[in-house]
From Swiss-Prot:
L-methionine binds at residues 440-442, 493, 608. CDD domains: CIMS_C_terminal_like, CIMS_N_terminal_like. This is 5-methyltetrahydropteroyltriglutamate--homocysteine methyltransferase. The gene is metE. 5-methyltetrahydropteroyltri-L-glutamate binds at residues 16-19, 121, 524-525, 570, 614.
Length: 764
């Protein structure tokens, strides 16, 4: 019999209950006990939804991040949060965001907050994790209380499950040394703690543990490969079965290593690594389980169940009970329930599967494999009809878009002149001081803004009323910026619910869910639009709002657009053509918007490519192809403008050292980047690469409520000036200010502007 299991379930709740519960707690509007009760309620609901599985995941729920959870389980807390009184949950939030609940920190020893842990992308996804911190003297100590609590809850519900933990080698790989030490040297100290954790679970009667080592789908040098051998040789002696889980890609040259590790089962991503399954069957010892991720855990399209059975059936016959099936990865990366989508176009809806529907697909596959296809004939027929409907739909294919794509030539992405000739023209037109100040784009999405938007969408507020409300918010943003003394202004994006969804709503080829939320980090959720067909722009999308904002001030007003690569990487993308083709379609559509903004007199246009790096394949050997079309798509979007129009781009959560040449090749006049959490370490890339254009290294972390001091900002910018000529430096926050409150934004920007004025006097 084939065994079914799941690697992880979305933790936020179908209606984002966790998000709202966290935010209530942080604001002091609810108690710690209420938050913990909400967590227990969500876990129970999610386990009940997975009752049909042979093994449900236990320990996949987190109040913020599963990597941070592992740091606490291993006793690896940064020294700056040690010694505070109160519940462990409050220290947990201090690491995550610099503060815990408002009421806790106001009466505790850290009312000024602490530095939040560094946050970066989880492999090539749009989820973010808190980076573990290591020192030469780091010690580990086991605290399994959270995992044991969840195990007890699951058992009380009668749930058959397996605890899920992050593997020791991936845990070290994901972290960062805070001194000159080598984090891999900590493995001998770490392994006994993992061994003790497995012993604890054994004592609880646990049979299987899922231990995640996704680094096996990356390029590993000899040291890291040996670390995996060492780790699992040490853990082999434990009296518990280990399912080693990999996901997000192919094993490649790590296949033999993965198959040889002394574990009891191996999970592989059969969406990306289907071609490796036969080799794994040959290489795995005859007593090992092979778990295949046959359902795409990262996208929302229905699985072609009949085609999947065509290749699973011979495998089941060959492996028998040794075959397990599951989604390719944790379902954290997809929304919870398609049944909530009552307003979604019925035809498009018929093509989709969210987390609960993916579990239904898994059940159909298992029934067909265990009892024959006849047992699920109706379900298979309905699935085949949906797959065929999508394949044949004229809504997916637009001949005019394909014709425009065919007309792209090598000149379309080139500026008329090089940066050295453009810069003086832009300087003359903009007349900016040294160390010019700006923000990244968005200002706080207040309750009034959200209320007006919801009223408008519900039909309770007419278009004129909505426009007036948004114009009032734009005017507020402009007046605040003028009062602060910022040099290049933004309109604040009051009218935008999301930097990707806003554009997708106005592009043909996109559809939108009501409740298709996925977690980005902590309480931050995003609702990726659904790119289902060929993309085109029926009309201008931003010109009216930007020109209104410009009419309110004599200072330069930035046009704000999201770039094609980011729109692509932050969407659920059609899987019936190469991603590059969809990206070029987006580039042509956004290019039209850029040119319309320029015609309207907009002097500075920002095209955000926050997600450029996260689209990189996990294996460096495949980077070249991706960067070629990604950079070309940006250039097509941006480079049709005149020399005196200044193009900005923004990138966040990016390590730039290894792609700095490609970033330079984008040829944006100004790039703004996230650097503050890394204390300007990201600028190390510029030690060996002379970046030719202007740059704004982010000087304060907008993801934390902490207010940066003027001296701190001056210090960061002086570090930047050691690497980049002062005349090419801008001063700006790390990212947009949408998620902050005005009460936090005003003092932070006040200090930022004051720091810029100090720098103009101190730095020549």
């Amino acid at each position: 019999m084939v065994t079914t299991h799941n690697l992880g379930f979305p933790r936020i709740g179908a209606q984002r209950e966790l998000k709202f519960g966290l935010e209530r707690y942080w604001k002091g509007e609810s108690s710690r006990d209420a938050l913990k009760a909400l967590g227990a309620e969500l876990r129970a609901r999610h386990w009940n939804a997975q009752r049909d599985l042979d093994l449900a995941p236990i320990g996949d729920f987190s109040f913020y991040d599963q990597v941070l959870d592992m740091s606490f389980t291993l006793g690896n807390l940064p020294k700056r949060v040690q010694g505070f009184h109160g519940d462990v949950l409050d220290n947990y939030f201090r690491v995550a965001r610099g503060r815990s609940a408002q009421v806790v920190d106001e009466h505790g020893a850290c009312c000024g907050g602490v530095s939040a842990g560094e946050m970066t992308k989880w492999f090539d996804t749009n989820y973010h994790y808190i980076v573990p911190e290591f020192h030469a003297d780091t010690n580990f100590s086991l605290d399994p209380s959270c995992l044991l609590q969840q195990l007890a809850e699951a058992r009380a519900l009668g749930v058959a499950g397996k605890p899920v933990i992050l593997g020791p080698v991936t845990y070290l790989w994901l972290g960062k040394e805070k001194d000159d030490s080598d984090r891999l040297a900590l493995l001998p100290k770490l392994l006994p703690v993992y061994g003790a954790l497995l012993d604890t679970l054994t004592a609880q009667g646990v049979e299987w543990v899922q231990i995640d080592e996704p680094i096996l789908v990356t390029e590993l040098d000899a040291e890291w490969r040996q670390a995996l051998r060492t780790a699992y040789a040490a853990l082999e002696t434990r009296r518990i079965k280990l399912l080693l889980a990999t996901y997000f890609g192919t094993l490649g040259d790590n296949l033999t290593l993965a198959a040889s590790l002394p574990v009891d089962g191996l999970h592989v991503d059969a969406i990306n690594a289907r071609d490796e399954v036969d080799a794994l069957v040959r290489e795995l010892p005859a007593d090992r389980v092979l778990s295949v991720g046959a359902i795409n855990g990262r996208n929302i399209w229905k699985t072609d169940l009949n085609a999947t059975l065509d290749w699973l059936e011979p495998l089941a016959k060959q492996l028998g009970d040794r075959l397990w099936i599951a989604p390719s990865c944790s379902l954290l990366h997809v929304p919870v329930d398609l049944a909530s989508e009552e307003k979604l176009d019925a035809e498009i809806r018929s093509w989709l599967a969210f987390a609960l529907q993916k579990l239904d697909e898994l059940k159909v596959l298992a029934t067909a494999l265990n009892q024959g296809r006849d047992k699920v004939a109706d379900a298979l027929a309905a699935n085949a009809a949906a797959i065929d409907s999508r394949r044949r739909s004229p809504r997916v294919n637009n001949p005019a878009v394909k014709a425009a794509l065919a007309r792209i030539d090598a000149q379309l992405g080139n500026r008329a002149s090089p940066y050295t000739q453009r810069a003086p023209k832009q300087s003359a037109r903009l007349n900016l001081p040294a160390f010019p100040t700006t923000t990244i784009g968005s200002f706080p999405q207040t309750a009034d803004i959200r209320h007006a938007r919801s009223q408008f969408k519900a039909g309770a507020l007419d278009e004129a009323g909505y426009r007036a409300a948004m114009q009032a918010e734009i005017e507020r943003s402009v007046r605040e910026q003028e009062s602060l003394g910022l040099d290049v202004l933004v309109h604040g994006e009051a009218e935008r619910n999301d930097m990707v969804e806003y554009f997708g709503e106005q592009l043909d080829g996109y559809a939108f869910s009501q409740f298709g939320w996925v977690q980005s980090y902590g309480s931050r959720c995003v609702k990726p639009p659904i790119l289902f067909g060929d993309i085109s722009r029926p009309k201008a999308m931003t010109v009216e709002w930007i020109t209104y904002a410009q009419s309110l001030t004599n200072k330069p007003m930035k046009g704000m657009l999201t770039g094609p690569v980011t729109i692509l990487n932050w969407s659920f993308v059609r899987d019936d053509q190469p991603r590059s083709v969809s990206c070029y379609q987006l580039a042509l559509a956004i290019r039209d918007e850029v040119l319309d903004l320029e015609k309207a007199g907009v002097r500075v246009i920002q095209i955000d490519e926050a997600a450029l790096r996260e689209g990189l394949p996990l294996r460096r050997a495949q980077w070249g192809e991706y960067l070629k079309w990604a950079v070309e798509a940006f250039r097509i979007t941006a480079n049709g403008v005149q020399d005196d129009t200044q193009i900005h781009t923004h990138m966040c959560y990016s390590e730039f050292n290894d792609i700095i040449a490609s970033i330079a090749d984008m040829d944006a006049d100004v790039i703004t980047i996230e650097t503050s959490r890394s204390d300007m370490e990201l600028l190390d890339a510029f030690d060996s690469f002379r970046y030719p254009n202007e740059i704004g290294p982010g000087v304060y972390d907008i993801h934390s409520p902490n207010i940066p001091t003027q001296d701190h900002i001056v210090g960061l910018m002086k570090k930047a000036a050691e690497r980049i000529p002062a005349e090419r430096l801008w001063v700006n926050p790390d990212c947009g200010l949408k998620t902050r409150q005005w009460a936090e934004v005003i003092p932070a920007l006040t200090n930022m502007v004051a720091a810029a004025k100090t720098l103009r006097n101190q730095v020549q």
